[in-house]
Amino acid sequence: MCIRDRNSWKPLWVVDFPLFEKENDQYFSLHHPFTSPHPNDIELLNSKPENIRSLGYDIVMNGYELGGGSIRIHDRKIQENIFNILGISKDEAKEKFGFLLDAFKYGAPPHGGMAFGFDRIVMLLAGSNQIRDVIAFPKTTSATSLMDNSPSNVDKAQQDELGLDIKSN
C-alpha cells in the first residue's frame, strides 16, 4: 500500500483552466471576466469559447490550494469580446467598466496577480488539516463567532448610535 509521507512537500501548479463554463446556453467566467485567454486560443473567441484555456493558475501543496491568480486582459477588443460572450451588453460594460475600457485606449502592459492564503500555509506548516486550528478568531461551522457571539441582534440604542433604521418584513 502506498501511504503519503506527511513530511514531504509536494507542490504543483494547476494551469490551463477553461476560460468559461457553460450552463443553460450561457457562458460564465470560470475565474473572473478579466482573465486573459491563452494566446494560442484567441481565434476560438468567435467560434468555440468553451474550448478556450485561460491564463489562470493555482498553486497547490499536498492537495491544498495555497493561492491563485491570473494574467489579466490588457487589450480593449479582447475585453469587449469577453463581455459579449458573457452576455454583458455594450451599455452595461460601459456603465460598469467604462473606466477600464477607456484606460485601454492609452495602452496597458501585460500584467497579472496572485494571492496566497497565508492561513493555509500556516495550517500546513503546523501539520494540521483544519484551517480553524490556525485562524486567530475562527467561526463555528454555523458561522458564529465564539469571541463576540456574532452575528447577533443589534439593540435599539446601538441602532440609534449608528444611525440605522432596520425595518422588518
Where are these predicted regions, by residue range?
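Structured aminoacyl-transfer and RNA-binding surfaces used for tRNA recognition/handling
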Residues: 4-169
